[in-house]
Amino acid sequence: MKFQPLGERVLVERLEEENKTSSGIIIPDNAKEKPLMGVVKAVSHKISEGCKCVKEGDVIAFGKYKGAEIVLDGVEYMVLELEDILGIVGSGSCCHTGNHDHKHAKEHEACCHDHKKH
């Protein structure tokens, strides 16, 4: 099923957490903490055509009590506001799209982090 987030939102599939500890103890599903990282599966048009800070396939970190859970075709997803994303894992900069050529940090901040203007 296709899902297109609206506003400044992204659709995220949580990354699976390990089922056992480093010492080999198996953790039952009901005792596991839900992971705070996931893979972006879809972004709203406002993000994809605006700041482009997050794109499909990015691994992101997000706040523990953020977003709304939905189920699509039997798979659990999170719908998160752009402002609830803490960062992109494994990326040196949110300008990883390669479309930016900033010489000063203030230009970078204005372009990539002032989402309300885009």
Curated annotation (Swiss-Prot):
It comes from Helicobacter pylori (strain G27). CDD domains: cpn10 (cd00320). SMART domains: Cpn10. It is found in: Cytoplasm. PROSITE patterns: CHAPERONINS_CPN10. This is Co-chaperonin GroES. Heptamer of 7 subunits arranged in a ring. Interacts with the chaperonin GroEL. One of its GO terms (biological process) is chaperone cofactor-dependent protein refolding. Transmembrane segments: none annotated. Belongs to the GroES chaperonin family. GO terms for molecular function: ATP binding; metal ion binding; protein folding chaperone; protein-folding chaperone binding; unfolded protein binding. It comes from the Bacteria. Together with the chaperonin GroEL, plays an essential role in assisting protein folding. The GroEL-GroES system forms a nano-cage that allows encapsulation of the non-native substrate proteins and provides a physical environment optimized to promote and accelerate protein folding. GroES binds to the apical surface of the GroEL ring, thereby capping the opening of the GroEL channel. One of its GO terms (cellular component) is cytoplasm. Pfam families: Cpn10. Its main location: cytoplasm. Keywords: Chaperone, Cytoplasm.
